Amino acid sequence: MQYRSLTKKILAIGAGAALAMGALSVGAQDEPFKVGFVYVGPVGDHGWTYRHDVGRQAIEEALGDAVESTFVESVPEGADAERVIRKLASEGHGLIFTTSFGFMNPTVKVAREFPDIKFEHATGYKQSDNVSTYSARFYEGRAVIGTMAGMMTEKNVIGYIASFPIPEVVRGINAFTIAMRKVNPEAEVKVVWVNSWYDPGKEADAARALIDQGADIITQHTDSPAPLQVAEERGVVGFGQASDMSAFAPKAQLTSIIDDWDAYYVERARAAIDGSWESQDVWKGIDSGMVAFAGYNDSVPADVQAAAELVKEGIVGGTMHPFQGPILNQAGEQVVGENEVIDDEVLLGMNFYVEGVQGELPK
């Protein structure tokens, strides 16, 4: 865990006239409003944590001298997280973002002790008067890249590097697989669980193992570019995660899902400052821009790009849903009927594999 950032005051300077006007809109105040962030990985992970830190910087750029932001990186989920969150709260941060699923219970516990402080927890499901939750419908992005994978694979084997067997990750695997098999019913997904959000060594080993098992396309729900770097070395292709990772694998990355928290973070910081902040539960997708994409690699055929764009348009327009039936589970049993759609409640608790995923889902 890195504490060097905890006490460092980061002030936006030289924001320019437009940003100064943005700062003025939140009202004059003697001291800057303090916003804290707790990260599960390093800001240099080039994935999940990196994108949250981009959002933190967006707050500074938008609100200028009205805010002061701090962050703590590489915080383990559990007791350490509780200690860090409490420390931020005791140091006068008026708004604290805790950006990993495993920070949920520590966030709720500390929030009870500091009822006047606002907390925002990413990907969780527990709210209170001073705790909001927010997430992105990452599964929509998985449907887009799953379509591409199904059209581009030559071996009909896709390797999927997964972090933890929680509903968010299982949803992504299933959405990817459903979309893939719509365009290529012969394709299958092999999953390797690394039980970590960020461990470049384990992620790289998982990628090698999947390629050795015949995968010619790699995707991931982990945070480092290591799987794509292995793909680049081994002459296969894949998809980035959370951020544009093409700098690490210019040939291998076909595109990447990008988590864009900027607008949400600015909106919530502004609300905390002007007094309009209220607890809420937010789950946004492609239509809001919270789920975005890197550009296509030049190697992606035009028809594949067109198919991916149609999926995006269908999701945004409401004519297509990644979990629209018929859907069969791994055992071949129908779990969603023709033209039925899995509702959010079931999606939020998803604990089964769909047809086309190999292996057992860890308990």
Indicate residue ranges for each PLM-predicted region.
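Bacterial N-terminal signal peptides
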Residues: 12-22
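Helix-centric, low-specificity signal for extended rod-like, repetitive segments
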Residues: 1-2, 44
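N-terminal twin-arginine translocation
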Residues: 3-6, 21-26
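A residue-level marker of the well-folded mature domains of exported/periplasmic proteins
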Residues: 28-363
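Generic anion/oxyanion-binding catalytic loop in active/binding sites
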Residues: 9, 17, 192
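Bacterial N-terminal signal peptides that target proteins for export
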Residues: 2-14
